[in-house]
C-alpha cells in the first residue's frame, strides 16, 4: 500500500511573511526527519529562496516556454537538508493568468507521479492569498491540499485576506474542497495584537496554530539567504517554528470556517479601532491592553 502523502497549503496576503513561515516549516519538518517538497505558487517565484542560499530557481512555466518536452526533474531542485524545491512561476508580464502556473505545475508533477517516486511525506504549497481566484484557489477547490492554513497578523488587510480565503473554503467545502486547519498568527508582539487575532478566530470558528513574534533573527537569517532553522537553529524563534511544524504534523482534523460578511468584518474592525484609540489615550480597555 502506497504511503499517504500529507499535502498542505499555506495562504497569506503578500508581504505578511507567508513564504518565510512556509520555508521555516519545511526546514523544521526536514530536520525532524520528514521528506519534504515546497511548492511555490506565487508569480514572484521566491518562495524557496531561503532554502537555497538566496538563489532563484527556474520556474515550471519558464521551463515549459523554453522546452517542448519537460521532465518533472527539470524543475525540481534540492535545497536545505534535502528539501525538494519547485516554483510554479507566472506568465510573461501583461499576459495570461498568474494562477495558471499552479494548475500547469501540479498537473505536470502528478502526471509523472513525482510525489510517489520521491517518497515524500509532505508537500507544502505556498500560495498567494490576496485573491482566491481560479488558479490560486486550485489547492482548495480541487482538494489537492488536505489541510489549509493561513498566515495573518493583526492588521486589517491581512485579516481581510484571511476572511476572503475562508469564503473560498466555505464555498468549495461541499464539493470535496480542502478545509481549514487553522490560523498562523505572525508578527504578534503586542498584547493587543494577540487579542485581535484571538477575537477574529473565535468569530470565524477556527483556531490559532501558533503565535509567531517578529524577530530580528528572521531578518538576519534571510539576509544570509537562509531560514532561521538553518541559520540559528537554537534560537527562540527557531523553537517556535519547530513547535508550529510539530502541531502541523499532529493536526488531523480540519473544518469549515464561518467567514464574516464584509459589513460584519468592517464593523468588527471599527470597534477594535476605537479600543486601540482608547488604549493609546491611556483609557485602558482590558481586551485591547491584554488585561494588563
Curated annotation (Swiss-Prot):
The modification ADP-ribosylarginine is found at residue 100. Transmembrane segments: none annotated. GO terms for molecular function: 4 iron, 4 sulfur cluster binding; ATP binding; metal ion binding; nitrogenase activity. GO terms for biological process: nitrogen fixation. Binds 1 [4Fe-4S] cluster per dimer. Pfam families: Fer4_NifH. Its EC number is 1.18.6.1. Its cofactor is [4Fe-4S] cluster. [4Fe-4S] cluster binds at residues 97, 133. Gene3D superfamilies: P-loop containing nucleotide triphosphate hydrolases (3.40.50.300). InterPro entries: NifH/chlL_CS (IPR030655), NifH/frxC (IPR000392), Nitrogenase_Fe_NifH (IPR005977), P-loop_NTPase (IPR027417). ATP binds at residues 12-19. Coiled coil: none annotated. Keywords: 4Fe-4S, ADP-ribosylation, ATP-binding, Iron, Iron-sulfur, Metal-binding, Nitrogen fixation, Nucleotide-binding, Oxidoreductase. The reversible ADP-ribosylation of Arg-100 inactivates the nitrogenase reductase and regulates nitrogenase activity. It catalyses: N2 + 8 reduced [2Fe-2S]-[ferredoxin] + 16 ATP + 16 H2O = H2 + 8 oxidized [2Fe-2S]-[ferredoxin] + 2 NH4(+) + 16 ADP + 16 phosphate + 6 H(+). Homodimer. The key enzymatic reactions in nitrogen fixation are catalyzed by the nitrogenase complex, which has 2 components: the iron protein and the molybdenum-iron protein. Belongs to the NifH/BchL/ChlL family. This is Nitrogenase iron protein 2. It comes from Paenibacillus durus. The gene is nifH2.
